[in-house]
Amino acid sequence: IVSWCILRGKCRSCGAKISARYTIVETLNALLYLWVFYHFNGIFNPLRAALVCLLFSALIVVFFMDWDTQLINTYVVIFIGLLGVAEYIFCKDQTGLTLKSHLIGFFIVSVPLLIICLITHEKAMGMGDVYLMAAAGLFLGMQGALVALLIGLITGSIGGLIQKHRSGDSVFAFGPYLSIGIAVAALYSEQIGSWYMDFTGLNEMMNEAMLIIR
C-alpha cells in the first residue's frame, strides 16, 4: 500500500500503471481484520477472530471475482465450508452454535435458492450463489444464514435498481451482495436477528405459541 502511494501507482522498473484495485483490496482487507479483532476482542479470542478474518478474505475474493465475471470460484466456496467445520470443532463454546444449527444453516437458505435456480434455469441466480450460501450457512448457523440472506436481498435490490437505472441492464451478479450479507451476519447476526424478530412481532407470536403449547 505504502509503495503504491510512493510510486504513484506505477511499476518501479517499467513505469506501467498499477490498478488502484490492488491497493483498495489490501486496504479493505486490513481494515476488516482490525474491525474483526476489535469486535471479538481478538487478544482473548484469537482463533475465533482468525477464522472470521479468513472468512472475510474469502468473501473479498468472491465479491470482486463475481462482480467482474459473474462466476464464483468453487475452491473459495469449499474453503469457506472448511472454515465452518473448523469453527464448530474449535469455537463451539464461544459461538454457542450446536452441530444441528450448523447443519440447518447449510440447508435453510441454499435449498430454497437451489429450487429457484432450477425453476428459472439459472436466470435468476447461478449455482455459485447456492454453493456460497450453503458453505456460509455451515459457518454462520441457522440464524446467521437467514440474516445473511436478508442483508443480501436488501443490498442486492438496491444495487440492482441502481444498475438498471444507470445502464438499463437488469442482470447483475448476486454474489457480491450475498458476500456483504455474510460479512454482516458473521459479526451481528444475533443483534439483527433479535431486532427483526421484535420489529415484525415474531418474538411475541412465538412466545404466545409456546404458552399455548405448554
Q: Where is each model-derived feature located?
A:
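Transmembrane helix-loop-helix
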Residues: F37-L51
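Membrane-embedded alpha-helical segments of multi-pass transporters/permeases
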Residues: L34, Y38, I89, L114, ...
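Functional transmembrane core segments of multi-pass inner-membrane proteins
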Residues: L54-S57, V61-S157, S194-R214
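Alpha-helical transmembrane segments and their cytosolic membrane-interface
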Residues: R12-L31, Y75, K123
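Hydrophobic, aromatic-rich alpha-helical transmembrane segments
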Residues: S19, T23, N45-A49, T74, ...
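Interfacial loop-to-transmembrane junctions
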Residues: L161-V184
